[in-house]
Amino acid sequence: MRASELKRIPSLVASKRRVVVIDAWHGLRVALATLSACVLLGACATKPLVPYSTDTPPMILAPATQAGIADERGRFREIYCAVLAARGPGLPDYRPCEDALTRVGTEPAGTGKPIALGQSRRHLVAAVVPGIGYDCFKPWLNPPDTVVTHLRQFGFDATLIDVDALSSSAHNARQIRDAIMAMPEPDGAPRIVLIGYSKGAPDMLEALVAYPEIRSRIAAAVSAAGAIGGSPLANDAEQYQADLLQYVPEATCTSGDDGAVQSLRPATRKMWLAQHPLPGGLRYYSIVTFPQPERISSILKSSYDKLSRVDSRNDSQLIFYDEVMPGSTLLAYVNADHWALAVPVARTHPTIGALFVTQNAYPREALAEAILRFVEEDLAKPPGR
C-alpha cells in the first residue's frame, strides 16, 4: 500500500464514523418524535390521574372469579410452555416459560391433558386490531411478518385490520365491521379470532356490539393488553398531543375524527361497558400484561411511575385489572411491558432498542401460537362446559 493511500485511511474512517453518527442521530430523532407525540404516556402534571367525579356508573373492585371471570391460567400455561419448549431457542426473543409469564396470586393447576402441537384442525385466523397511533408509525417500524410466517407453519393464519390511528373507538368499529364483511364468508364454523391490542380492544368490542352482522363470522374475541377499562393516563392527555404522531417520519395517518384519547379515558370506557353488555354466543378471552418492574423499558419508566400513583401493577400504560373483558376467560398474566407484547421496536431498530426500548424482547410468535391453540381447544368444548 502506498504512503498516500495510508494517509487517506484516517479520513475515510472519520467519514464512516460521521455517517454512523448521522444515521444514529436520525434514528434518535425518530424515536424522540414518536415519544414526544405520545406524551399521554407520561405527562408531567401533578393533578390526580383519576379526578373527582360523580359521572360514573356504580363500580366495584372484586376478585375475578366473583365477577364472572373464568380463570384458565393453569391450562394456558401448559400450552404456552409446551409451545416454547417445542419451538425452542430458535424462536426470536426466546424466553423460558417461567420468565415469560407472571404468577399472580394462586394460579390454578394445569390439567395434565395432552397438548396438540401439530396442524390446526380449525385453521383459525387471528385478525388483529392495533392500538392508538399504529397507522402513524407502522411505516417507520416496518415490522417483520415473523408471527404470520410462524403461524402458517401450523395451519393457522393472521391478518392486520387497518383502523384509523387517531380516531374514536366508535369510528374504528365501523372499519372493523367493513373489514370483516369483506372477508370470505365461512362455509363452516367461523375461523376469525379477533385480537384487540391496547385501544384496539375497545374498538373491537364496539364493533361486536354495534354490528351484529359480523358475529356469525367470529369464532372468538381476545383482549391482548386491551384498554377495556381505559387508562388513567388518558385523563391527563389531550387529543392534539396524540395528533403529533402524524409527524413521525414516513407517517401517512390523519387525525381522523380526533376521538382516540377520549375513547381511552376511564370514564368513557366504563360508562360504555355499563350501557353495552357484550353479545352472547361468543367466547371472550383476556391476556393481561403484568410485568415485573425490571421488565419495563427505560423509555416507559416515567409513565410506569406516573401510573403507579394509582397502582404500581401496571404495564406503563394500563393497570392490570383494566385489561380484563367482562365475562371473559383469563388466560395469562404476561411478563412484558405494554410495547413488548406487540410492538417489536428493538427488532427493526436495534440502536433505539438498546438505548430506549430496553425491555422490548418477547417471544410473540410463541405467544400467538399458544393463544390460538388454547382457543381452538376451548371452542371444541360445548358452551358452558
Positions of PLM-derived features:
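N-terminal secretory signal peptides that target proteins for export/translocation
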Residues: 1-26
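Flexible, membrane-associating and regulatory peripheral segments of lipid-active enzymes
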Residues: 2, 44-140, 150, 383-385
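Bacterial N-terminal signal peptides
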Residues: 31-42
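Active-site catalytic motif of lipid deacylating hydrolases and related acyltransferases
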Residues: 117-191
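Structural recognition of the beta-strand scaffold that forms the well-ordered cores
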Residues: 126-128, 159-162, 193-194, 222-223, ...
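Solvent-exposed loop/turn segments at secondary-structure junctions
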Residues: 132-135, 164-167, 198-202, 226-230, ...
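Serine-dependent carboxylesterase/thioesterase catalytic core
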Residues: 174-274
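C-terminal catalytic-base region of ester-bond hydrolases, centering on the histidine
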Residues: 279-385
